[in-house]
């Protein structure tokens, strides 16, 4: 029996997503709202100041809500360091009720190694007594050196091996370690023409690492390419344009191979791209798939309020009528506008009626192990036969 977590919480609570858009450099496959920042600058200070103001703004409308989860993503949140990340969390604690927080999550890169270890230790020291779960997700992405190079990553296989081995002493009882991988679809060929993934030693290390069950969970994604991505702007580079990143079939074959290794090691597939040991699944990510309430804070962050939490006062302040069943909305994607405290994108409000809501609930349910348990509520949407 797979329990989703051991922490009681209300589905009426709010989850908070905080977007940190700064990166050491932009990865070639990345479609997220982020940009390279060579070193810490006034932009980070200005951004944190604006983020604090946005926190205060939402607390005026949702002060009665308890906060269920807090999730830092980007970008590369570890560029801020432990002190600035803690500063943002302290601001959240001042303006929201975080006393029943179920999960505090951070997305980090696995480099620079010593800096990451220091940040993890400092965040654990600051918050391990406050919150029942601190989740760190590390973007490993691949164990293939050529893929890592072409993708614009700043580490290679042996560096990742060292990172994972040296990370082990930092594990605590209330710490969850998640590791992200992407199926890029690059297969090598042996002299006999047989395809193989990565190198034999890299694939064996992955298998041994998974079987050790040091990792609490894995996220396994497939490469997706969009018109605005850096890779699309490098069509003149033959290596990137087709030599390694090939067909959807090859991408799926890599995904399938890695997926089977995870399943054989008793990681439970609780969502299409996510696998975990018992009670170690991401509490925050389930809020998306189960259409619970969340606010996105920061540049280009998305929010959703469902029909259980339609705050008419909040909608009045936006100058829009209260939606029938829910509302999706986004922040501006202009860093200048955001730092000038113009947070919301006025063109990105998507009200949901009852039919819209049911359609989203149905298809999001298909993504998870919970499925669509009450099929009868969707009969009005289903086509006969």
Residue ranges and their predicted role:
Residues 233-314:
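A C-terminal junction/extension of Radical SAM enzymes
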Residues 286-290, 296-385:
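Hydrophobic, secondary-structure "cap" segments at the distal end of domains
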Residues 12-16:
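Extreme N-terminal starter segment of soluble prokaryotic enzymes
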Residues 24, 143, 225, 276, ...:
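Short, solvent-exposed loop/turn segments at secondary-structure junctions
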Residues 34-61, 67-260:
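Conserved non-cysteine loop/helix-boundary elements of the Radical SAM core domain that shape
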Residues 21-34:
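Local cysteine-cluster metal-coordination motifs and their immediate loop/turn environment
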């Amino acid at each position: 029996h797979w329990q989703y977590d051991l922490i009681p919480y209300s589905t009426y609570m709010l989850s908070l997503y905080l977007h940190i858009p700064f990166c050491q450099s932009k990865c070639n496959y990345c479609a997220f709202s982020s940009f390279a920042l060579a070193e810490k600058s006034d932009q980070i200070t200005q951004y944190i100041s604006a983020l604090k103001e946005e926190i205060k703004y939402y607390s005026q409308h949702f002060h009665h809500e308890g906060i269920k989860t807090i999730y830092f993503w980007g970008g590369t949140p570890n560029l801020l360091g432990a002190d600035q990340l803690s500063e943002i969390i302290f601001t959240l604690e001042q303006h929201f009720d975080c006393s029943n927080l179920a999960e505090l999550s951070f997305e980090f890169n696995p480099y620079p190694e010593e800096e990451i270890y220091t940040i993890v230790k400092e965040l654990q020291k600051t918050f391990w007594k406050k919150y029942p779960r601190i989740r760190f997700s590390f973007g490993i992405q691949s164990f293939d050196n050529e893929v890592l190079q072409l993708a614009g990553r700043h580490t290679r296989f042996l560096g990742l091996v060292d990172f994972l081995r040296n990370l082990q002493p930092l594990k605590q009882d209330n710490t969850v370690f998640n590791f992200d991988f992407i199926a890029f679809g690059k297969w090598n060929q042996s002299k006999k023409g047989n395809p193989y993934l990565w190198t034999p030693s890299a694939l064996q290390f992955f298998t041994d690492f998974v079987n050790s069950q040091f990792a609490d969970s894995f996220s396994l994604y497939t490469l997706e390419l969009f018109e605005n991505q850096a890779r699309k702007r490098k069509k003149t580079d033959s290596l990137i344009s087709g030599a390694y990143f090939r067909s959807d079939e090859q991408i799926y074959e890599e995904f399938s191979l890695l997926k089977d290794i995870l399943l054989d090691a008793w990681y439970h597939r609780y969502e299409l791209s996510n696998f975990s040991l018992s009670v170690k699944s991401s509490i925050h990510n389930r809020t998306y798939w189960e259409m619970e309430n969340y606010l996105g804070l920061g540049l280009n962050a998305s929010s959703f309020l469902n029909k259980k939490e339609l705050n008419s006062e909040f909608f009045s302040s936006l100058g829009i009528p209260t939606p029938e069943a829910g509302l999706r909305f986004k922040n501006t994607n202009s860093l200048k506008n955001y730092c000038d405290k113009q947070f919301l994108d006025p063109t990105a409000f998507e009200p949901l009626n009852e039919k819209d809501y049911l359609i989203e609930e149905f298809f999001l349910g298909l993504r998870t192990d919970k499925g669509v348990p009450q099929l009868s509520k969707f009969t009005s949407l289903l086509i006969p036969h």
